[in-house]
């Protein structure tokens, strides 16, 4: 059985009763769907730093860029306790080989963005970041991160999961002997996936790989990884996907019959207009890639960047 990808996650999202009131926030998509392909490494900042359950609820107070973590009723300041624990915990998480993290939204410890921070008048502003989440993201700047709430947006979900699987493939590459040739092969397989996120990074990464002979693998690999993960963070769009589909069609356009060409172009247009999801023209492309035996296209990760069971390309 293929090894599951490991990602960190806020413990309450797995259904564990660790919230301040003794409850949980189980996310069925995470546990029942993603759980088929991912191994979760749970983290509960409040429990792990010794605050227990049940506990008094807390909030962030002060300036959004440097807030304090304070209990609501008794006004006990747990800032130093949380920061000390968080800095130690991220060091421990380095050993877990994580390929991503799913945070609990709006949490004063784990919210990724738009967390309420209360000013001196007690008025909240949604400009904060959870105390643990901030330290985690600063420590692991290239790691894909998301919140449970944002994962209900299908496009954010697809982008996050695509990056998780891409990082795992990168890690598998790095685990082997580093060489320019292996990096070139990796880039070749990911060319169209990168292009689907934008021309700019496609050009920059292509230039870096073209100059690989003049750079030592020790320098080349970190440079490539940073640019690669930065590229995939950019959202794909219908226009970008159409560009990639047309690019792929160009490899076997002359072999297509008139009817085949018309059918393919019609599916492109229907996808462009929002009548059908990406999976439809992509399935047709895959058919012709096999029928007309296109080795370069067969190796493209863009065709299968994540498990088809997740149905991430089934939305119009």
Language-model segment annotations:
Residues 17-18, 22, 26-68:
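N-terminal glycine-rich anion-binding loop in soluble enzyme alpha/beta folds
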Residues 2-7:
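Extreme N-terminal starter segment of soluble prokaryotic enzymes
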Residues 89, 93-174:
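Internal, conserved structured core segments that host functional sites
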Residues 74-95:
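Glycine-rich anion/phosphate-binding loops
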Residues 144-316:
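Acidic, Ser/Pro/Thr-rich low-complexity regulatory regions
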Residues 10-11, 44, 102-106:
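Short beta-strand segments
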Residues 59-76, 116-126:
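A charged helix-plus-loop insertion that forms the helical arch/lid used to bind
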Residues 14-19, 110-111:
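Short glycine-rich His-centered loop
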